[in-house]
């Protein structure tokens, strides 16, 4: 499923009309196209309905979900919760996109009240992994002004260097030489020199498409209806303010003209009526200056009225009435299906749909954005329906995380703690414990696992008193619950060390078949995508064989979470440029990993920049299937991995999820002792997904 994100270069460019036409153009190309506007922006006269969503729903017969209210979005932004906002939008988008080949997503329109629109649009496009299409108006401005607006907006999305920035649709073009427009724009902007940035549509100005119905004039001017006539059908193609005597004005009485005149100008009223009786389909008659028409004159004009001539009155004088008409909102009214349909087809016919359809057919390198990762992680955890034990059941963050997981259906959490103690902590912290949250008093169940533990460790000389003593540690108790199959996974580490969490697992759970060691990965939520770092927490100095094992484990973990694994074996040199014991270890690990999994994309040794940055990768490792596009980064030792992970996390303010332990027969995961409630929630979700994949 492909996604196009359309965003405007300013206010009044016709973004929604372009979205209508874009969906129709994609349908012309044989694709089933859907629409979604993530954030509501109210329009004048439509206080209850989100304009874009409602108009597209009525015109195209689609059923897009309701967008988030602007007030909700502003509250989340103000609280610094943009990641939560994006995750919610990704969730709604996934639901909205089911069954479609392609989705058109409409961004926020920058206005003086929504100055943050461009920042939100940038995050939206990235979170939805979308191709970006700019929409700009070429109405009256000079070419330099047009290109300046396009370039400024393009910079928000990475400019010409971003291959996902496809081009621009130019709307409201008031020239008959649109074919020459591209060459003219190239002379004013280097952006158009890039072969990847194209004009995707040139939509000329068409007066007839902007003609409102007389009913719209009545509504917006709050006019009083004298004769409704065909006000729902007749359209205002031109407006004429009649001030001269009738004989001097008759040539202005043309089809589609709205006659504006003071209500006491009986001569103009009768002249307009005669024109209608002679077959001229005037748009209507608007009487101003608070002069009601003379009933005797209206009786004389009855023939014209019965032929459908709309007549209405306003209280404003001629000058103010003309000004009000000029200020009318020319957007398509929600109930004007005829005009919406005509504009949709007109725009669609001026969009280069063959380019967009071709783009949809091109294989795209999958990139999992942080909000999409979090959404997918939670959804898969909910589907897994796993029981996860939390040995640190008294710890406040753990209690709150368990509450969230229980309420959201992420996992069925088991707190190892006395229920009264848990309730006391929850009460003190203002946490409402949900129904069904399981709390087990460790003192009442320790002896239940003595025999099973002795059986598992009898080869090490373990006896019952020794087992009971070890079971006093809740981590050991929780690990035994996992070993006996009573729970599906274990999460600990908020107050315990990594060694205290992992040691019981190595002794009682042991490694999974086919794996020689236990390692770890962090999921690094970089701004553009989620990547995997391994091993940054467990193995100090792995051998080449162990490093190959870590690479294969990490690739499997990435794949389980929807990340396409492209594995970079990292070193301080790239390819054959360096030598030494450490480089040779990485080279040998790469060979072993490729031998074990020839279907995986694995390359090394690679320097970090060659693995992560496309331009550097092309220069340092031309022909590499991984360089510049790696999603799984395997560090040569713990010192390098842990230092890099913390440097990226802190200096770039990157959220990380993990460490997730891999290679165990059943999932056990360690927390950082500084873990937030959110960190614990996502680690529980990770554990549930791991458990489901091992069933």
UniProtKB/Swiss-Prot annotation:
Pathways per UniProt: Metabolic intermediate biosynthesis; acetyl-CoA biosynthesis; acetyl-CoA from acetate: step 2/2
Keywords on record: Acyltransferase, Cytoplasm, Transferase
Pfam families: AAA_26, DRTGG, PTA_PTB
BP GO annotations: acetyl-CoA biosynthetic process
Enzyme class label: transferase
UniProt xrefs under InterPro entries: DRTGG, P-Actrans_bac, P-loop_NTPase, P_AcTrfase, P_AcTrfase_dom1, P_AcTrfase_dom2, Phos_Acetyltrans/Butyryltrans, PTA_PTB
Chain residue ranges for the region called Phosphate acetyltransferase: 372-695
Single annotated GO MF: phosphate acetyltransferase activity
Listed EC numbers: 2.3.1.8
Family to which the UniProt record says this protein belongs: In the N-terminal section; belongs to the CobB/CobQ family. In the C-terminal section; belongs to the phosphate acetyltransferase and butyryltransferase family.
Domain comment in the entry: The N-terminal region seems to be important for proper quaternary structure. The C-terminal region contains the substrate-binding site.
Stored PANTHER family: PHOSPHATE ACETYLTRANSFERASE
Stated name of the protein: Phosphate acetyltransferase
Organism: Nitrosomonas europaea (strain ATCC 19718 / CIP 103999 / KCTC 2705 / NBRC 14298)
């Amino acid at each position: 499923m492909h996604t196009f994100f359309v965003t405007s270069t300013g206010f009044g460019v016709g973004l929604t009309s372009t979205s209508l036409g874009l969906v129709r153009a994609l349908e012309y190309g044989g694709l089933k196209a859907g629409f979604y506007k993530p954030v509501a922006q109210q329009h004048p006269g439509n206080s209850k309905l989100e304009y874009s969503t409602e108009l597209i729903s009525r015109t195209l017969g689609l059923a897009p979900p309701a967008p988030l209210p602007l007030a909700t979005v502003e509250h989340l932004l103000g609280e610094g919760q943009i990641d939560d906002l994006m995750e919610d939008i990704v969730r709604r988008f996934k639901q909205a996109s089911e069954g479609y080949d392609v989705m058109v997503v409409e961004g926020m329109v920058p206005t003086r009240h929504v100055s943050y629109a461009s920042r939100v649009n940038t995050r939206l496009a990235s979170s939805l992994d979308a191709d970006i299409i700019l929409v700009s108006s070429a109405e009256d401005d000079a070419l330099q002004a047009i290109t300046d607006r396009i370039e400024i907006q393009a910079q928000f999305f990475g400019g010409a260097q971003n291959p996902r920035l496809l081009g621009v649709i130019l709307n409201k073009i008031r020239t008959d030489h649109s074919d020459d427009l591209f060459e003219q724009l190239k002379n004013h902007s280097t952006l158009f020199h890039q072969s990847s940035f194209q004009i995707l549509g040139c939509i000329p100005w068409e007066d007839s498409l902007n003609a409102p119905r007389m009913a719209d004039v009545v509504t917006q001017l709050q006019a009083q209806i004298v004769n409704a006539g065909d006000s729902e059908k007749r359209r205002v193609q031109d407006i004429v303010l009649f001030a001269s005597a009738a004989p001097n004005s008759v040539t202005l009485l043309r089809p589609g003209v709205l006659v504006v005149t003071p209500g006491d100008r009986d001569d103009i009223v009768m002249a307009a009526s005669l024109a209608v009786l002679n077959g001229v389909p005037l748009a209507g008659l608007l009487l101003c200056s608070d002069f009601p028409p003379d009933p005797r004159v209206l009786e004389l004009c009855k023939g014209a009225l019965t032929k459908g001539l709309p007549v209405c009155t306003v209280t404003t004088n001629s000058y103010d009435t003309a000004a009000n008409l000029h200020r009318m909102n020319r957007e398509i009214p929600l109930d004007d299906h005829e005009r919406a349909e005509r504009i949709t087809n007109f725009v669609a016919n001026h969009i280069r749909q063959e380019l967009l359809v071709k783009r949809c057919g091109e294989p795209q390198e999958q990139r999992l954005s942080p909000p999409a990762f979090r959404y997918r992680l939670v959804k898969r955890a909910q589907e897994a329906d796993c029981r996860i034990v939390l040995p640190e059941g008294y710890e406040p963050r753990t209690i709150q995380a368990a509450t969230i997981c229980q309420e959201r259906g992420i996992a069925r959490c088991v707190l190892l703690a006395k229920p009264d103690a848990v309730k006391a902590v929850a009460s003190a912290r203002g946490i409402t414990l949900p129904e069904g949250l399981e709390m087990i008093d460790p003192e009442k169940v320790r002896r239940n696992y003595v025999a099973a533990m002795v059986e598992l460790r009898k080869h090490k000389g373990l006896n019952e008193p020794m087992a009971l003593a070890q079971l006093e540690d809740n981590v050991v108790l929780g690990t035994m619950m996992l070993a006996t199959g009573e729970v599906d996974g274990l999460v600990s580490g908020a107050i315990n060390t990594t060694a205290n969490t992992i040691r019981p697992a190595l002794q009682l759970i042991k490694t999974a078949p086919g794996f020689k060691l236990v390692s770890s990965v962090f999921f690094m939520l970089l701004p553009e995508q989620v990547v995997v770092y391994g091993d940054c927490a467990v193995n100090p100095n792995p051998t080449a064989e162990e490093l190959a094992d870590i690479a294969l484990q990490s690739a499997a973990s990435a794949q389980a979470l929807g990340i396409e694994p492209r594995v970079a074996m990292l070193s301080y040199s790239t390819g054959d440029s360096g030598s030494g014991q450490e480089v040779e270890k990485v080279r040998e690990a790469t060979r072993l990993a490729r031998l074990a999994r020839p279907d995986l994309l694995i390359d090394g040794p690679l320097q970090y920049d060659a693995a992560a940055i496309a331009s550097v990768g092309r220069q340092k490792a031309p022909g590499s299937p991984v360089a510049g596009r790696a999603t799984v980064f395997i560090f040569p030792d713990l010192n390098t991995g842990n230092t890099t992970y913390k440097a990226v996390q802190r200096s770039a303010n990157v959220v990380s999820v993990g460490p997730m332990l891999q290679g165990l027969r059943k999932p056990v995961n360690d927390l950082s002792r500084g873990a937030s409630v959110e960190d614990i929630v996502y680690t529980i979700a990770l554990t549930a997904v791991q458990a489901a994949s091992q069933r």
